[in-house]
C-alpha cells in the first residue's frame, strides 16, 4: 500500500452505488427511493489515494451488488487500523426507516435533567480539586533543585565547613564621565541662594572652570529670582578686571530645566581661609593684601557705575596665585548713567554687612557706592579680629545695634592708629561723611607695605605647598582604563636608566580644610578671640569648632554660642537679663507678696514676633 498523500489539491472520493452510467439508469427505474439514497455521501479523508488492491473495487469489473453497511464498516475499520486514517460516515443512518425514535416519557425527561445537574456539579468540583491536576514533573524537579541550593547557601548545616562562607562579589558598574556642552563635570565646590557650584574642565582647552547651576523651579520660588539672574548676566558680560570674577559662557538646557553659568576657577574663598584658622582671623599683613585687592575691584565696579551691595568674605574668591576676585552679583545694581551720585532704591545684602541707611529705612534712597564701602569696612574688621563690629543674636537687635551703638575697636589684637582711623571712617554712620573708594585708596594705612603684599607670608606658602583639589580626578581616570594617579610610573630610557615618577599630588576633595596643608602653622586662638559671647573666657584659647558663614538669605543670622558654665552668672550680671529682649520660658515667675492679687507676667512685645530664628534649632 502507498502512504496517504498530503497534497492540498487532493479531491475527496465519493463512493456511490453504481459508478457506471448504464447501471445508474437501471437502478433509477427499479428503485423508487434511489434518488433519496443518492444524496448519501461517504466523507473520506481528502488525502486518501486510490488503492488498486482494495477488495471493494476491482479494476475492470463493475460492482456486482450494492454497497452494504457491513462492507463499508469493514473497509473503514481496516484502513483506519493500517494507515491511521480517520474515516467517518456523515449522515449514513439519517434516513434509516427501520430505526424509529421512541417517544420520551415525562419520567425519562426528569431523569435526564437530574443527571445533567449532577454532571455540572461534578465538573465544578473537578476544577477546584488539586489531586485531579498534579504539578508537572519539571516544576517539581526545579523546586527540589532550588531548595537544595538555598539550604547549602544559607549554611543550615553548621557541621559542614564547606558552606561556612558565601562568596559574594557584587557587580559594580563604574559610572562614566559626565560631559555637557564640552565640559567634563566634577564635584560640588560650593552652594548659594540660587543653586550649587561644581567644578568642570574644558575638554578643548583643558582649563579648569567653575559652573553655577540654577534650576527653573528654584528661581521661580525666590522673589525676583529671574530678574536678579538676568541682571547678574548683563553686568558680568561687561566686566573685565583681574579682581572681578570672569564670566566665560552661559548656556541653557530647557530639557533639564537648568541654566548654566561658567566662570573662571578659584580654589576657595576668604571665608574658608578664616574658617581654617583656629583664631578665626588673619594676620595684619594678610588682611592688608586682601583689602588692597578688594578696593581695586570695587574701584573698577564703581567706575562702571555698578554697586555690588553684598561685599563680605564669602563673596571674595581666591585664585591659585592668591588674587582676590569679587563674585556673586545677584543683588548688584546698575546705576543710571545720567545720575550724579550712586542712588539706589533696592535694599539687598547680608544683615551684618548692611549700613545704617539701609536697615533704618528712613531715607527714600541710599548711596550704593557708600554702602559698598561700609561693607568693605566690616570685612576688614572681620579679617583682622575675627569678630564683627556690630553683632546681636536677634535680627531686630542687630539692626538697632548697627544704627545706634558706637563703634568699639577689637581688644584681642593690637591695631595701629592708622588702621583704627581707617576703620572709624569706613564705619561712619552718616554716609555723607563716609569716604569713597578713591579716598580710601589714598589713606596712609592703605599705602603702607607688608611682606604679604609682595607674595610672601603664610598664605602664599600654603598655596605653594598644599594639595591641589581636583574633583574631576575620577572622571579623568575613567577615560583611561588602568591608569590611576596613585600608581607609580617606572620609565626606562634608551640608555637603560630607570626613572621612578612619584604619584601625582592631587586630591578629589573640593573644600579647603586644614588636612589639605600638612605641616602648616596656623594662628592659635588666644583669650578674646572668637565671638563676643566668649570674649575673655579661659576656654576661648582652645580651637573653635566650624561655624556658619555670615548671614544670608539661604543661611540666616545665627546666634553665637553661649558662655561657659563657669562664667554663666558673670556674663548674665554684666549683660543683664533682658539684653536680647526675649523672656526666657524656663525662668520661674517672680514671687508675689503675701495677700497681694496675682499679677500677670510681663512679656516683651517682640518676644512673640521676633523670637530668635536659631534658638529653637
UniProtKB/Swiss-Prot annotation:
Q: Where is the composition biased (Pro residues)?
A: 587-597
Any single GO CC term annotated in Swiss-Prot or TrEMBL for this entry: cytoplasm
EC class (word): transferase
Give the gene symbol: par-4
Q: Where is the composition biased (Polar residues)?
A: 1-11
Where does the record place the catalytic residues? 310 (proton acceptor)
Q: What is its EC number?
A: 2.7.11.1
The family line of this record is:
Belongs to the protein kinase superfamily. CAMK Ser/Thr protein kinase family. LKB1 subfamily.
Presence of the UniProt keyword Cytoplasm in the record:
yes
Q: How does it assemble?
A: Interacts with strd-1.
Which InterPro entries does this entry report, sorted A to Z? Kinase-like_dom_sf, Prot_kinase_dom, Protein_kinase_ATP_BS, Ser/Thr_kinase_AS
Listed binding positions for ATP are 189-197, 212
Alphabetized SMART domains for the sequence? S_TKc
What's a BP term from Gene Ontology annotated to this protein?
regulation of actomyosin contractile ring contraction
Species source reads Caenorhabditis elegans
Q: Which UniProt keywords apply?
A: ATP-binding, Cytoplasm, Developmental protein, Kinase, Magnesium, Manganese, Metal-binding, Nucleotide-binding, Serine/threonine-protein kinase, Stress response, Transferase
Role played? Required for cytoplasmic partitioning and asymmetric cell division in early embryogenesis. Controls the asymmetric cell division of the Q.p neuroblast lineage. Involved in mediating cell polarization via regulation of anillin family scaffold proteins. Phosphorylates and restricts the asymmetry effectors mex-5 and mex-6 to the anterior cytoplasm of the zygote and maintains these phosphorylations until fertilization. May phosphorylate par-1. Required for strd-1 localization to the cell cortex of early embryos and may be required for strd-1 protein stabilization.
Q: Where in this chain does the entry annotate a coiled-coil region?
A: none
Entry's Gene Ontology molecular function annotations: ATP binding; calmodulin binding; metal ion binding; protein serine kinase activity; protein serine/threonine kinase activity
Q: What is this protein called?
A: Serine/threonine-protein kinase par-4
